[in-house]
C-alpha cells in the first residue's frame, strides 16, 4: 500500500507573487492532543483529521422527532438531493438499521463508526436510539458507536450511554448567552412544556452544561459543534470556545450556517446569510490556540455513508439493502484495518522525510493551495472528477489543513461545463495553485488566466505542496 512516487509538474508560466501578501491568515497556533487521546480517536474520521483520509463512517436515520426548533433547521424525511444535517431519504426501524450496518460493514470494511444524528435528536427518541445501539454492539463489536445531540436530554442518559460503551458524543452548542439563543431557537420543548425566547434558550444551555460535565466525569469524549451565524453569534463563539474547554470538551467544530432559501429554514427564508470562507477561518483561527479545532467537517446528512466527502447513501437505500445479505466479517475487517494502519505508518514516515530540515521562517509568506484527493493523504484525483477541494496552508516549513470546499465536478459526460468551471474558480480564487493527478490543457490554461497555477502529481500532499511552494517562493 506504499504510495507511488511519480514526481510532479508545475505549469510553466509562473505569475509574479507579492512577497508581503500571502493568504492573510494563520493556522500555526494549534493545540496538540496527548497520545492516549489520539489512540481513542485514531480510527474515528469525524474526531480525527488524519483518520478521515482513511476510514469511513455511516449514520442511520432512526430518530425523527426533535425537542427544539432551530432557525437553521428543516428536517426532511424523503429527500435525496440535499446535503446537510437533518435530511434523509427514508426513516429506519432499529432492526432495519442494524441490518444496514452489517451489510455496509461487509461492503465497506474501512467503515469504523456508526453514528445516530437524526434527522431529529437521538435523545428525543431514546428507545429507538438505544435499541439500535444495542443491536449493533451485539453483532458488530468492533464498530465505534457515537451520537450527536442538542444536549437537552443528555443529563438523563449519560449513564445509559456509558453502559453501551458509546465513547463519542457530539453536542451542538451555539451560544452561552440566552439572549443570543433566543435569536437561534424558535422553541424548546422540555418536560411537556414548550418554552420560547430567552427562557427556552436558558433551559437548553443549563442542560447542555450539565451534560457536558457529566460526560467528562464518565470519561466520554465530547466534541462540540457550533453553527456560525453572522451578525448573531459570530463574535460570541470565542467565548463559547473558552467555556466548553473549561467544561471538558476536547474538540470544537465551528460550522458555517447553511441557509439556502430552497431548504425552507427560517434563516433561509428570511435572508440570513452564512459566513464567507474568510470569516469562518478567522473565527476558527481565533479559537485554535485554546483547544483543538475540527476543520474537516462535511455537515453530513443524517443517513450519510462512506468516507467524509464521499456520500454513498444512495447505494444503500432501503429497497436495496434489505435485499442484501449481511457480509460482516470481523477477521476480514481487521485485516483491512491492519493494512490501513501499515499504510498510515508509511505515510507518516514519508511526511516526516519531506518536512525534515524545513526551518520555520517568519519572513516566509503563507499561501493556500487546493488539493484534489480521493483520500489516503495523497494528491490522487483528476481535476474534472473532484466534487470538493481540500485547502491547505503552506509556508515553506509546514503544511496545514484549513478546510474543504464543495464544487460540482467539472467533467460530465466527457465535457467540461463552463458555468461549473466558473464556480470552481470562484471557490478556490484565494488559492495560488490547485494540485491534481491530471488535468486537461483547456482548464489548465483557464486556471492560469485566473491566476491559479496547476500541479500534476500523484504523491503525498505535503511533498507536492512544499515543492510547489519552493518554486513559487523563488519568484
Curated annotation (Swiss-Prot):
Residues 52-303 form the Radical SAM core domain. Its cofactor is [4Fe-4S] cluster. It comes from the Bacteria. GO terms for biological process: nitrogen fixation. Pathway: Cofactor biosynthesis; Fe-Mo cofactor biosynthesis. Residues 1-17 have a biased composition (Polar residues). Gene3D superfamilies: Aldolase class I, Dinitrogenase iron-molybdenum cofactor biosynthesis domain. PROSITE patterns: MOAA_NIFB_PQQE, RADICAL_SAM. Involved in the biosynthesis of the iron-molybdenum cofactor (FeMo-co or M-cluster) found in the dinitrogenase enzyme of the nitrogenase complex in nitrogen-fixing microorganisms. NifB catalyzes the crucial step of radical SAM-dependent carbide insertion that occurs concomitant with the insertion of a 9th sulfur and the rearrangement/coupling of two [4Fe-4S] clusters into a [8Fe-9S-C] cluster, the precursor to the M-cluster. PANTHER family: FEMO COFACTOR BIOSYNTHESIS PROTEIN NIFB (PTHR43787:SF13), FEMO COFACTOR BIOSYNTHESIS PROTEIN NIFB-RELATED (PTHR43787). This is FeMo cofactor biosynthesis protein NifB. It comes from Nostoc sp. (strain PCC 7120 / SAG 25.82 / UTEX 2576).
Amino acid at each position: 500500500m506504499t504510495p507511488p512516487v511519480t514526481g510532479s509538474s508545475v505549469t510553466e508560466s509562473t505569475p509574479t507573487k507579492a512577497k508581503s501578501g500571502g493568504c492573510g491568515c494563520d493556522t500555526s497556533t494549534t493545540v496538540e492532543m496527548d497520545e492516549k487521546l489520539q489512540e481513542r480517536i485514531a480510527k474515528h474520521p469525524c474526531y480525527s483529521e488524519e483518520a478521515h483520509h482513511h476510514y469511513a463512517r455511516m449514520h442511520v436515520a432512526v430518530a425523527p422527532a426533535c425537542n427544539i426548533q432551530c432557525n437553521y433547521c428543516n428536517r426532511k424525511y424523503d429527500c435525496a438531493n440535499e446535503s446537510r444535517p437533518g435530511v434523509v431519504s427514508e426513516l429506519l426501524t432499529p432492526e432495519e438499521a442494524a441490518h444496514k450496518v452489517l451489510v455496509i460493514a461487509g461492503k465497506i470494511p474501512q467503515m469504523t463508526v456508526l453514528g445516530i444524528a437524526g434527522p431529529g435528536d437521538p435523545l428525543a427518541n431514546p428507545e429507538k436510539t438505544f435499541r439500535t445501539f444495542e443491536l449493533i454492539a451485539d453483532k458488530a463489536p468492533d464498530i465505534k458507536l457515537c451520537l450527536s445531540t442538542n444536549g437537552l436530554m443528555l443529563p438523563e442518559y449519560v449513564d445509559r450511554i456509558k453502559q453501551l460503551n458509546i465513547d463519542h458524543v457530539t453536542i451542538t452548542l451555539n451560544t452561552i448567552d440566552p439572549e443570543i439563543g433566543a435569536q437561534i431557537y424558535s422553541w424548546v420543548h422540555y418536560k411537556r412544556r414548550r418554552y420560547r425566547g430567552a427562557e427556552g434558550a436558558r433551559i437548553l444551555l443549563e442542560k447542555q452544561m450539565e451534560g457536558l460535565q457529566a460526560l467528562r466525569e464518565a470519561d466520554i469524549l465530547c466534541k462540540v459543534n457550533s453553527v456560525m451565524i453572522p451578525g448573531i453569534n459570530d463574535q460570541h463563539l470565542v467565548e463559547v470556545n473558552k467555556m466548553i474547554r473549561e467544561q471538558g470538551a476536547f474538540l470544537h467544530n465551528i460550522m458555517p450556517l447553511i441557509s439556502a432559501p430552497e431548504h425552507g429554514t427560517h434563516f433561509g427564508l428570511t435572508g440570513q446569510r452564512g459566513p464567507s470562507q474568510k470569516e469562518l477561518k478567522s473565527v476558527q483561527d481565533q479559537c485554535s490556540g485554546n483547544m483543538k479545532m475540527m476543520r474537516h467537517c462535511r455537515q453530513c446528512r443524517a443517513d450519510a455513508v462512506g468516507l467524509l466527502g464521499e456520500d454513498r447513501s444512495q447505494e444503500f437505500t432501503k429497497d436495496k439493502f434489505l435485499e442484501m445479505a449481511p457480509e460482516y466479517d470481523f477477521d476480514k475487517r481487521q485485516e483491512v484495518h491492519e493494512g490501513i494502519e501499515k499504510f498510515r505508518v508509511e505515510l507518516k514516515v514519508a511526511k516526516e522525510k519531506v518536512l525534515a530540515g524545513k526551518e520555520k521562517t517568519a519572513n516566509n509568506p503563507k499561501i493556500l493551495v487546493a488539493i484534489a484527493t480521493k483520500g489516503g493523504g495523497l494528491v490522487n484525483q483528476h481535476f474534472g472528477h473532484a466534487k470538493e477541494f481540500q485547502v491547505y496552508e503552506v509556508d515553506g516549513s509546514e503544511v496545514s489543513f484549513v478546510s474543504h470546499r464543495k464544487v460540482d465536478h467539472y467533467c460530465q459526460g466527457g465535457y467540461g461545463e463552463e458555468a461549473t468551471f466558473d464556480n470552481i474558480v470562484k471557490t478556490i480564487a484565494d488559492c495560488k495553485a490547485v494540485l491534481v493527478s491530471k488535468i486537461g490543457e483547456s482548464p489548465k490554461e483557464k486556471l492560469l488566466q485566473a491566476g491559479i497555477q496547476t500541479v500534476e502529481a500523484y504523491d503525498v500532499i505535503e511533498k507536492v505542496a512544499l515543492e510547489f511552494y519552493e518554486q513559487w517562493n523563488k519568484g
